[in-house]
Amino acid sequence: MSDFLPFSRPAMGAEELAAVKTVLDSGWITTGPKNQELEAAFCRLTGNQYAVAVSSATAGMHIALMALGIGEGDEVITPSMTWVSTLNMIVLLGANPVMVDVDRDTLMVTPEHIEAAITPQTKAIIPVHYAGAPADLDAIYALGERYGIPVIEDAAHATGTSYKGRHIGARGTAIFSFHAIKNITCAEGGIVVTDNPQFADKLRSLKFHGLGVDAWDRQSGGRAPQAEVLAPGYKYNLPDLNAAIALAQLQKLDALNARRAAIAAQYHQAMADLPFQPLSLPSWEHIHAWHLFIIRVDEARCGITRDALMASLKTKGIGTGLHFRAAHTQKYYRERFPTLTLPDTEWNSERICSLPLFPDMTESDFDRVITALHQIAGQ
C-alpha cells in the first residue's frame, strides 16, 4: 500500500546528493580521498587512532578475525542473539563459534556467561552492543585482560553510543555498520576502529587483495604501479561514492540520534498503558543510540503471539522487524549444535519485535503505531 509505514527508512537529503555529485565531478569514484576523510572523521568521533573503512561490517568482522589469526580449531565467544554474519565469518575461517546466553531483560551478553565459556582454545570475545545500548565493557575487557583474549566489539548498532563517558570503540577495536537501516548509512558499508597500528595495517592489506596499497595510494603517492601481495586478501574496499554519503550522514549524527531518542521516549511513555514490554536499559552509565526500539510480546501477558502481532500490524500498513531470531535456532547452527540451549535468548527470540523508529518518522506516524497497538491489545 502507498501509505505503508516501514520500521526503518534512511534519512537522506540535499547534503547527501551534493556529496555524491562532488565525487562524480571529481573523476575519482572508487576508494580515495573521501575514504580518508571518513576514516579521520570517525576517529574524531570515537577517539581512536586508526579507522579502516570497508564495504560492510560483515567484511570488517571477517578481516578483523583474520588479522587476529583466527583459524582451524580456535573458539570465538559471541552471543547467539546477534545477526548471523558474525557466526558465519567464524565458521568460514574454520573456527568454532561458542554461543552464549544474554541477560533476559536487556539482551546484553554478560561477563558471567562469557567467562563460563572460556577454554584454552578461546581466541576472541565478541560482545554485541545491542539495539544501540552498550555492553558492560569494563567487565568484559577485564576478562580479556585476565585470560589474554582479544575483544572485538560488534558495534553495528552503536554509532553514537557511549559507555561511561566514552564513545564505543575508544577502549580497543570495534566494528560499525553503515547498512541502510543503521543510524548513519551509505547504503552498504562499515568501518573498523582500533588503536593498534599493526592491526590497522593488516586490515588495510586484507581489505584490498592483500596488497600493501590501494588504487588511490598508487595514483596519488607516486608509488610503483604494481604493489606486492603481502598475504591473500579480499575485495572489501569502500567506494568514495559511499564514503561521501557516510560523511554527510556523520555530520548529522547528533541530530539524527536526538530524534531517535525523542521517539524512543515517546514509545516508553506510551507503553505504560500497553501490555507489550520494552527492553530494560543497562544499569551502567551510557548514552543510547536507539538504533532499534524493541518490545517483547508474551502471549500470556498480551493475549497475542509476536508473529500474530506483526501480521496484524502489517494489515494496518505498519512494518516491523525481528532483531534477531537467535542464531543457534537457524537451520545450519541448530543442526551443528543440536544440544545447545540458551533459555533467555530463546525466550526473547520468540517474543521480540522491532517497532518503527527512524529520524524522519512524524508524530502522525507515531500516533498511528500506538493507535494500532491499542486496537490489537483490545483497548
Swiss-Prot record:
GO MF terms here are: pyridoxal phosphate binding; UDP-4-amino-4-deoxy-L-arabinose aminotransferase
One Pfam entry for this protein is DegT_DnrJ_EryC1
Show the disulfide pairing.
Answer: none
- A GO cellular-component term linked to this record: membrane
Enzymatic reactions = UDP-4-amino-4-deoxy-beta-L-arabinose + 2-oxoglutarate = UDP-beta-L-threo-pentopyranos-4-ulose + L-glutamate
Q: Which residues carry this modification: N6-(pyridoxal phosphate)lysine?
A: K182
Q: Which CDD domains match?
A: AHBA_syn
Q: What keywords is this UniProt entry annotated with? A: Aminotransferase, Antibiotic resistance, Lipid A biosynthesis, Lipid biosynthesis, Lipid metabolism, Lipopolysaccharide biosynthesis, Pyridoxal phosphate, Transferase
Q: Biological process (GO) annotations?
A: lipid A biosynthetic process; lipopolysaccharide biosynthetic process; response to antibiotic
Q: What is its EC number?
A: 2.6.1.87
Pathway the protein contributes to: Nucleotide-sugar biosynthesis; UDP-4-deoxy-4-formamido-beta-L-arabinose biosynthesis; UDP-4-deoxy-4-formamido-beta-L-arabinose from UDP-alpha-D-glucuronate: step 2/3; Bacterial outer membrane biogenesis; lipopolysaccharide biosynthesis
Q: Which InterPro entries match?
A: ArnB_NH2Trfase, DegT/StrS_aminotransferase, PyrdxlP-dep_Trfase, PyrdxlP-dep_Trfase_major, PyrdxlP-dep_Trfase_small
Query: What does the subunit section of this Swiss-Prot or TrEMBL entry state?
Result: Homodimer.
Q: What does this protein do?
A: Catalyzes the conversion of UDP-4-keto-arabinose (UDP-Ara4O) to UDP-4-amino-4-deoxy-L-arabinose (UDP-L-Ara4N). The modified arabinose is attached to lipid A and is required for resistance to polymyxin and cationic antimicrobial peptides.
UniProt family annotation: Belongs to the DegT/DnrJ/EryC1 family. ArnB subfamily.
Name used for this protein in its record: UDP-4-amino-4-deoxy-L-arabinose--oxoglutarate aminotransferase
